[in-house]
Design a protein with these regions (language model features):
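Sequence signature of WD/YWTD-type beta-propeller architectures
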Residues: 1-175
Length: 175
């Protein structure tokens, strides 16, 4: 992970990782200013923006993450195993299930916890239909992933699911 100023200067490495650590879906933890990210499929972590100190929020299979505005809760989907949408307390790591998405979460890449290598793409090319390319097969078609988000007032969440065979947007109330 790196950060850089808007004008392109001041590039600095915040955290360097190898292919054995799958660091993904970095975003700001609401208004806290800290950075939250997943070490998929092992943990949800937060980095202090100023000191770079890293704390594990939860040893859990969080995948696509969406913090609330205050940075107190993190909405996430899950994969391998798919346990539906979860809300994780950023302070305690406690979680509660919102719903099951029944998304197919396609993509051979997600069956292991390291980045795709050239040989993965070469192998994927051997089994493609005329509608697919290696990126879809190795990394997984994005339209099959839930990618949850909060409503403006944070009383509902939206997510995608291809449970019917066609990707559609669903809304789940949190009340």
């Amino acid at each position: 992970m790196h950060r850089v100023r808007r004008d392109g200067t001041g590039l600095e490495c915040l955290y360097q990782h190898g292919n054995d650590e799958f660091i993904v879906h970095e975003t700001f933890l609401g208004s806290t200013g800290d950075l939250v990210f997943t070490v998929w499929p092992h943990a949800l972590r937060v980095m202090d923006w100023t000191t770079r100190a890293i704390r594990t929020i939860a040893k859990y299979n969080a995948w696509h993450i969406a913090p609330d505005r205050a940075g107190r809760r993190i909405l996430c989907d899950t994969n391998h195993p798919d346990e539906g949408l979860q809300i994780i307390d950023a302070g305690t790591g406690a979680r509660r299930q919102v719903c099951l998405t029944q998304s197919s979460n396609q993509g051979s890449q997600w069956r292991r916890s390291s980045y795709a290598l050239p040989e993965d793409f070469a192998q994927a090319r051997n089994t493609l239909s005329w509608m697919e390319n290696a990126v879809d097969t190795v990394y997984g078609p994005q339209h099959t992933h839930p990618h949850p988000s909060w409503s403006r007032d944070e009383s509902q969440v939206a997510f995608a699911s291809d449970r019917t065979g066609v990707t559609q947007v669903y809304i789940a109330s949190l009340s």
